Amino acid sequence: MKADSSSSSSMSSRMRLRNSHGVGSSSQDWSPFSRHRYSALSSQEDYRSEESEEFGPVFIQEPDDAIFSLDSDDKKIIMNCEARGNPVPTYSWLINGTNVDTEADFRYSLIDGNLIIHNASEVIDYGRYQCRAENSIGIVLSRDALLQFAYLGPFSGKTRGAVSVREGQGVVLMCAPPSHSPEIIYSWVFNELPSFVAEDSRRFISQETGNLYIPKVQPSDVGSYVCQVKNTVTNARVLSPPTPLTLKTDGVMGEYEPKIEAHFPQTVLAAKGVTVRLECFALGNPVPTITWRKMSGNIPKKARLRKSQAVLEIPNIQLEDSGSYECKAENTRGGTAFRGHLQVYTLPQWISMINDTQLDSGEQLRWECRATGKPRPTYRWLRNGEPLSTQSRVEMVNGELTIHRLQQADSGMYQCIAENKYGAIYSSAELKILASAPMFNNNPVRLIATVGKDVSLECRPRASPKPRISWRKNDRRLQPSRRIMLLRNNTLRIINSSRSDEGSYVCRAENQFGSAELTTVLLVKEPMRVELSPLRVEVTVGESVVLSCKVTHDPSLDVSFLWLLNNQPLNTQQDGGHFEYIQTQSSTADLMIRSILLKHAGKYGCRAQTSTDSVLAEAELLVRGPPGPPGVVIVEEITASTATLSWSHGVDNHSPITTYNVQARSPVSLGWQTVKTDPDPVTGSMESAMAVDLNPWVEYEFRVVATNSIGTGDPSPPSRAVRTKEAVPSVAPANVRGGNGRRHELVISWEPVSEEYQNGEGFGYIVAFRVNGTRGWKEKMVTSADSTTYKYRDETFPPLTPFEVRVGVYNNKGDGPFSEVVTVFSAEGEPREPPSEVQAFAVSSSEIKVLWKPPSPGLGRPQGYEVSFWKDVEQEELGKKKRTLGNETNMLLSGLDGNTQYLVSVKGFNSAGQGPSSTAVKISTKKNAPSLPPGNLMWIQEGNNVSLSWDPVKARDNESEVIGYKVLLRQEGRGHSQVMRTPNSAVVLTLPEGGTYIIEVRAVSEGGEGAASAQVRVLTSSGVRAKNGQLSVQNSPPGLAWTALFLSLMVPSFPL
């Protein structure tokens, strides 16, 4: 929208987007006179700041295009429409431009703005619908929505004749679809469902005509064909009558050139953004091949070929995809082509829309709306839903509306419509013509100023048209001067005010509708003075200080204080309680700073404020503390053991730096370590030093820490990592030793030298050894820096031969030192004799105890023993082995099968290998424990004594005989159980304390324990205990007579 130059300021300030708010800004003009006649509306928020303010209808929801299925059980259609406005809008509807009479036609009803259509009929209700929203401000029309009806009629029941062709000839089977709406999808059934025709280079189904094309018929094509159509909305399907396809018997069709039978239209219209599918298929023998090209330019890269190249598919079509496309069909007999034009259109889209506007009567309105589209849109204008016609005051040119000399009757709702042949879009706005007498909201006004300061007296009446403004003081008309100015916005500006400016100022506003006055009483007070002490103070970290702020001001005014640090408000509630605000009198305010930190240094401000004045006084706080971090460390030069470093001074925090400490870190060090320097010490005036006694070929980082009389500060950022130069190794391996190994081996081991002391690349070890009493050394190179062992084998070595051994180091720079000479013995031999007196005893059905004696002392002493055991019916290789942890001479074998004979042998072993096995001994495990649990548990309780009995358990033939019973007792909620043994099938228990106890019984045999009985739960009296706090047991005689009380038992299931 544009505005004439004569009124652009007023118009732009009062034009508002209906869906968003714009905020304007203005700059002051210090000219003493102003001719500006309008009061500006700052934003739409001002315009509609209250719910009570009236405004025209604004659509929240407009009707959308809809497709209704005639097969739907619910014959009701709802077209939605909703608008906001004040007063609340009322609604009506148009169908194809004609009003819908909801009172005369019972099929139509309105719920709020929604139109309900009952018993919908395609004949009556098909068309374009518009919603009309109306209130006292005006009328707006929605976009139009197309209502269509989806249906699919039946095929004609007429029998279709057979199609007879020669083999090799082409054929087109016609679908002749029934009436339908909207689009349908075609497919063909061959002979019977669900056998559908598969499309390939020899079969094509056109989605434009529905016909089936077969360029070269083969015997396998003979059969019955049925066309199936499917509605894309309702998913309804119908089948055509069958069309038989037969072969003639008068010969085979020869080759013939292609003939295009299915192709896209010569002109294809497509909306921007949709997917376009161009069809092209030909008959011919041999079967033709299809190729595509774009006549001007290349086919879009996004395009895809479908159905054996018979369909060119272009997704998300754009304007640049327009043009002529050609499909070509070729075979060995010739070729043919078809060419058509693809034209892409776009619906109108807004570039600029119209906005709500309010203007004074007599002014000029100029609205402009602009839209893009292909074809280019044309424009129409509506006022209150009716076409706006050109008059002497009204001009409409290319989307621009101009109304001269606005009148109150021009108020209302306006709509700009941009449309082309494919669609239309609407932009709505309200035009409000203002006409009111001046009015002031607040009257009178009391204003207080300070001597020597400027003061502004505002005059902002609400009026339309803009009123004329005049000022007077104490009933005398004010004349502008160098010190008193009337600004363009009607504000009275007084420069350098004094007590003589006090008085009553009256602003008078008047227009043709009336007048109003605003009285402002101006009082001028003496300025305020603020003293802050001390103005500059130095403290040390950890100390405290108090800043005192005193103010002198007019006693009739209240004063408030605000403390600032470096021009930012100070929050005394934060920062760990370092700040405390203290005010003992209305004119003083103190700030206490406790346990001062370096970050508390800076400029502190005390701002005193009254309703007329604001004064700031500032003081500087200097904090002495440890130095700040030095600048980043730079490595100037590096050698094998030194590094020359430089850095820059950090802040000294008001206490001179006395010394620097140089630190280094390497991948093998424990964090940062202080290093020796030259010079030593490094004084605070220096910015370089040499780190000495570094290890060669180690990657170091360096940093520097400064110290002053207050303390040590934070370290500098670390230097880049640098590696010292290589040097000959200087550290020999430690803890050289040896021994063990296999027969005829000499095993030498050592602790590896850490990377920190390898001093260069190519690090390795030199292992030197000789038999005691000989002169020459044998030397072997070990090239791995991580190696810890070297083995030397010589068949001539007797076991335990003593050797003198030493281990040295080397790297690419040369050989380093050797370790001290130590004596190392060669390996002894594997055991020569087997263990003797091997015995085995059955412990239970699953355990065997094995005992033996070690072989006679001598070379090849065992370091441990290996026991092998296997079933008598198995081979030894299938058995198991188990080793002792040391030189034990017994072992318990468990996890064995019951009542089974095993063979057991023992052999010794040491680091040299295994010795011979002993002779195998045979041993049988005991029979399995009884599988049946004790049954028929009965009990009698007298106090804390419980008499318990059960039926004896009888062992089966393959089970061990019962030799007694084990009674297990535990208190509920505890894991520990007490165990009692008895040879009888009855016991008397004295329970140790009150509570609930769980009792179960197991049979005991040589084969182990049997299955558990059902659990018995017994509740004893609280507080009753046995004398010694332990469970006491009395065995009952076998013939004891029982009077039994059965409990609720927890009975597990057992196999019989």
Swiss-Prot record:
CDD domains: FN3, IgI_1_Contactin-5. A lipid is attached at residue 1035 (GPI-anchor amidated asparagine). Residues 1-33, 711-736 are annotated as: Disordered. It is a lipid-anchor; GPI-anchor. GO terms for cellular component: neuron projection; plasma membrane; side of membrane. It is found in: Cell membrane. Glycans are attached at residues 96, 119, 355, 489, 496, 772, 887, 945, 958. Disulfide bonds join 81-131, 175-227, 280-327, 369-416, 459-507, 549-606. Residues 1-14 have a biased composition (Low complexity). PROSITE patterns: FN3, IG_LIKE. Its main location: membrane. Residues 22-31 have a biased composition (Polar residues). Residues 1036-1056 form a propeptide. One of its GO terms (biological process) is cell adhesion. Residues 57-142, 154-240, 258-343, 348-432, 438-519, 527-622 form the Ig-like C2-type domain. Residues 629-727, 732-829, 834-928, 933-1023 form the Fibronectin type-III domain. Belongs to the immunoglobulin superfamily. Contactin family. Contactins mediate cell surface interactions during nervous system development. This is Contactin-5.
